[in-house]
Amino acid sequence: MNQGRIWTVVKPTVGLPLLLGSVAIMVFLVHFAVLTHTTWVAKFMNGKAAAIESSIKAV
């Protein structure tokens, strides 16, 4: 492991909670952004059927 020396600078009891906490915050922010900036994700999460926006005409 080439990043093993990081624990000589930061204790694992401090570094691991910071790392896992920052990952959890980023995951929350990404999910919040997807839910607030799309119209179909919230409906999908609530079990609604997908609506077809346009129909394809047969040739």
From Swiss-Prot:
UniProt key word Metal-binding: yes
Cellular compartments per GO CC: organelle inner membrane; plasma membrane; plasma membrane light-harvesting complex
Regions that span the bilayer: 12-35
Compartments where located: Cell inner membrane
Record-linked InterPro entries: Antenna_a/b, Antenna_alpha, Antenna_alpha_CS, Light-harvesting_complex
Keyword Lyase belongs to the record: no
Topology with respect to the bilayer: Single-pass type II membrane protein
Residues exposed to the Cytoplasmic side: 1-11
GO BP annotations, alphabetical order: photosynthesis, light reaction
UniProt binding sites for a bacteriochlorophyll: H31
Top-level division of the source organism's lineage: Bacteria
GO function term, MF aspect, one: electron transporter, transferring electrons within the cyclic electron transport pathway of photosynthesis activity
Keywords assigned by UniProt, alphabetized: Antenna complex, Bacteriochlorophyll, Cell inner membrane, Cell membrane, Chlorophyll, Chromophore, Light-harvesting polypeptide, Magnesium, Membrane, Metal-binding, Transmembrane, Transmembrane helix
Topological region Periplasmic: 36-59
Function description: Antenna complexes are light-harvesting systems, which transfer the excitation energy to the reaction centers.
Similarity remark: Belongs to the antenna complex alpha subunit family.
Subunit and partners: The core complex is formed by different alpha and beta chains, binding bacteriochlorophyll molecules, and arranged most probably in tetrameric structures disposed around the reaction center. The non-pigmented gamma chains may constitute additional components.
Protein name, UniProt field: Light-harvesting protein B-800-850 alpha chain D
Source organism of this protein record: Rhodopseudomonas palustris (strain ATCC BAA-98 / CGA009)
